[in-house]
UniProtKB/Swiss-Prot annotation:
Protein name as it appears in the record: Small ribosomal subunit protein uS11
Function: Located on the platform of the 30S subunit, it bridges several disparate RNA helices of the 16S rRNA. Forms part of the Shine-Dalgarno cleft in the 70S ribosome.
GO annotation terms (biological process): translation
Gene3D superfamilies per record: Ribosomal protein S11
Stored InterPro entries: Ribosomal_uS11, Ribosomal_uS11_bac-type, Ribosomal_uS11_sf
Pfam families for the chain: Ribosomal_S11 (PF00411)
GO cellular component, one term: ribosome
Amino acid sequence: MFMIKKKKNKNKFKKNINLGIAHIHTTFNNTILTITDLQGNTITWSSAGSLGFKGSRKSTPFAAQIASSTAAKAALEHGMLKVEVFIKGPGAGREASIRSLQASGLEITSIRDVTTVPHNGCRPPKRPRG
């Protein structure tokens, strides 16, 4: 028998970008963070689910903190220094992800809440009974 050698893709090249945008999407189940340049091209992304958190652990602030620090380290490798933050959603990881971005060395220039608010559209899901 013989082994098939896998070729490693080297399509991840280093970009020199000083200013970027961090899009943080927090839901009740997960936190997704995408860091883009000013044109909207994705530099790096991370989510709580992609880092191995499963089930209800994905929705914790700790999972959001780990996801945002992972994305911030990758953005720092691309030369990013400053970032604008657009945060969307009602999730638990809102503040934790912003704090983690700041602690990892990115300078936050502005924070915008772009959560969409319905003008009494769809009926919301039932409230959890606790």
